Amino acid sequence: MSANIGKIVQVIGAVVDVEFPSGNLPNILSALDIKNPNNSDAPQLVCEVAQHLGDNVVRTIAMDATEGLVRGMEAVDTGKPIMVPVGKASLGRIMNVVGRPVDEMGPIKTDKYLPIHRPAPEFTEQNTKVELLETGIKVVDLLIPFPKGGKMGLFGGAGVGKTVILMEMINNIAKQHGGISVFAGVGERTREGNDLYHEMKDAGVLEKAALIYGQMNEPPGARARVALTALACAEYFRDIENQDVLLFVDNIFRFTQAGSEVSALLGRMPSAVGYQPTLGTDLGGLQERITSTVKGSITSVQAVYVPADDLTDPAPATTFSHLDGTLVLSRQIAELGIYPAVDPLDSTSRILDPNVVGPEHYSVARAVQQVLQKYKDLQDIIAILGMDELSDEDKLTVARARRIQRFLSQPFHVAETFTGTPGVYVKLEDTIKAFRGILNGDFDHLAEGDFYMVGGIETALEKYKKRQEQQ
């Protein structure tokens, strides 16, 4: 069968128009290969068909820089969407939006390829059972439990520890559950992507993860598709290898932002705040594929940037409607030196429900939140009048709240190199038992410092015993 070849008729930024012979128009979302003129390592420039303009012309979005393209150049229709390498060969590797390795470790040796555009699983294939995914991080497991096959948003500013929590989760899932992680760097800083790769390599978790990067310097076409490339990788592990997969997306906002950049070039009328009119469809198409099926699950953690801290902005507002829970990182808590700096009162989870997590877990979690909320309410009084003016009951509440606050901190495996403290994975039942004990006053004789940066309650008791012996 002879190749279907068209010719470039127009180039506007990241958008390329190609004319094909009559009756041979490529399908929407098909990939076209153009011999790469800008002398980069990649032999072809890949473009994705976005529109049929009439007169046998298609409008495409380029997945790489379009410098050096001229009218009359040949574009070959591949007849299928962008296909990316999947499976075991992709683990421990970094690839770009079209599945080419960018880690200078040679080609990805596999015969398994999947298209990046795939339908979401049918209702009949979806698993409706709600299960909790244990992460081994106390504050997450107790107060913001992760649903298996659910979607969690990670909200936080710069430098409060989003990446460290992501890495710890990748580490814990890999070691405890033997699970596989896929990391999608969507429009993030190249430096951060580089740091993540080397940190994961040093922490020994790289062999259980596939990294797919489309950084800030990439054209919008690549940034708008790189999340789908990562998703295709994750879907293979879920559907073919029957695995439970973790999909990390940093940052989901950049996916929307890239879509809005190409939207105007495609001649679409902008909607609110200049976003693409197809915002809901674009995001829905991505999010609906992230789900649990009868074969396996994809659990997703998505970092969400909130433009100008405005949660009503269309991009974060649309993202919210898809999430099962929010993990909010707070600068105030990070300033106290409590890591992970999760805000226990601002974070929410859909499955913190007695029918899912059980009455014991639910009652402990709610009691912890009540004590912390009471402490927060009393802080103004303490600041003005001091602790002595509080009633005995309030003094006890404050003492327990401060113990709880410190016990919510935890040493991480991936941070061992710079904390010098070995990381700890805490089982959920141990977490619940320990917090129940603190609430009941079983550990009122321990000092606040005994609870800081420990894993289980046994370590806190050991600290106390050591101190007693020294005295």
Swiss-Prot record:
Annotated GO MF terms: ATP binding; ATP hydrolysis activity; proton-transporting ATP synthase activity, rotational mechanism
NCBIfam families: atpD
Gene of this entry: atpD
Organism for this UniProt entry: Nitratidesulfovibrio vulgaris (strain DSM 19637 / Miyazaki F)
Binding residues annotated for ATP, in chain numbering: 156-163
Location in or out of the cell: Cell inner membrane
Catalytic activity: ATP + H2O + 4 H(+)(in) = ADP + phosphate + 5 H(+)(out)
Official protein name in the record: ATP synthase subunit beta
UniProt cross-references to HAMAP family, sorted A to Z: ATP_synth_beta_bact
Pfam family, one: ATP-synt_ab
